[in-house]
């Protein structure tokens, strides 16, 4: 055995060589015996968990015996304690707080429809897109015979054709051109007063030259079949 470490026997106090003071209630020695085994989850006497499971004979149907299996049959025989007081049913209520059965709903979803989004056949706006930045035309899914090799249908969100929102032209505030609001004529530069304001000019649209129908410029190649 290791001479430095030798485990003490039960009931022998610890060797307090340095004289360290311990708080009241501190175990100054090994326990004389291990604590008694308790089948409860928490230590300490709890009369509600010490009772045996008691049920009339007509309660134990085949379905219940199938659900609980061996543990249920052993509990009925009194071999193991259960957490149920005598005279109370073993099943938990549907609503432990009120004890009432929740209302019937034809939907298998246990959540309310108004709280959660619902997938619909109509177009949905992307909630993360800027709502005022673009005008979107109504977007509907085409029938399958149109989609086939023809149209790419996007998922719910912003459609492919987006129109930029028009930018409002600045309003004139009655100030002379080139002047800053809140200043006088003497404070403004003469060049700014005399310089003309650039008027918007429409971009020149180039139209392709029209070629009258006639003999094409390329030579006619007869079919090869």
Swiss-Prot record:
Task: Give residue spans on the Cytoplasmic membrane side.
Answer: 1-58, 194-225
**Membrane topology of the entry:** Multi-pass membrane protein
> Which residues are listed as membrane-spanning?
59-75, 174-193
Q: Name one Pfam family in it.
A: TCRP1
Its cellular-component GO annotations read: axon; perinuclear region of cytoplasm; plasma membrane
Keyword Protein biosynthesis in the entry? The reply is no
Q: Does the keyword Acyltransferase apply?
A: no
Record keywords: Cell membrane, Cell projection, Cytoplasm, Membrane, Transmembrane, Transmembrane helix
Report the locations given in the UniProt record.
Cytoplasm, Perinuclear region; Cell membrane; Cell projection, Axon
Entry-linked InterPro entries: FAM168A/MANI
Membrane topology (Extracellular):
76-173
Family as reported in the entry's similarity comment:
Belongs to the FAM168 family.
Job of this protein: Inhibitor of neuronal axonal outgrowth.
What is the designated name of this protein?
Myelin-associated neurite-outgrowth inhibitor
Query: What is the gene name?
Result: fam168b
């Amino acid at each position: 055995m290791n001479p430095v470490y030798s485990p003490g026997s039960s009931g022998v106090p610890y060797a307090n060589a340095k004289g360290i003071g311990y708080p009241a209630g501190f175990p100054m020695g090994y326990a004389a015996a291990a604590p008694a085994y308790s089948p409860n989850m928490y230590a300490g006497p709890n009369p509600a968990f010490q009772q045996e499971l008691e049920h009339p004979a007509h309660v134990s149907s085949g379905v219940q015996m199938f659900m609980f299996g061996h543990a249920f049959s052993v509990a009925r025989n009194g071999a193991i304690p259960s957490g149920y007081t005598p005279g109370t049913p073993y099943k938990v209520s549907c609503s432990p707080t009120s004890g009432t059965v929740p209302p019937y709903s034809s939907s298998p979803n246990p959540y309310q429809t108004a709280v959660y989004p619902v997938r619909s056949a109509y177009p949905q706006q992307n909630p993360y897109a800027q709502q005022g930045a673009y005008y979107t035309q109504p977007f509907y899914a085409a029938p399958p015979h149109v989609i086939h090799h023809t149209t790419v249908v996007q998922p719910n969100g912003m459609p492919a054709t987006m129109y930029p929102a028009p930018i409002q032209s600045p309003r004139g505030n009655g100030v002379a051109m080139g002047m800053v609001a809140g200043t006088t004529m003497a404070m403004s530069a003469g060049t700014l007063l005399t310089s003309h304001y650039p008027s918007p000019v429409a971009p020149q649209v180039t139209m392709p030259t029209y070629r009258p129908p006639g003999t094409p410029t390329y030579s006619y190649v007869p079919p090869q079949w």
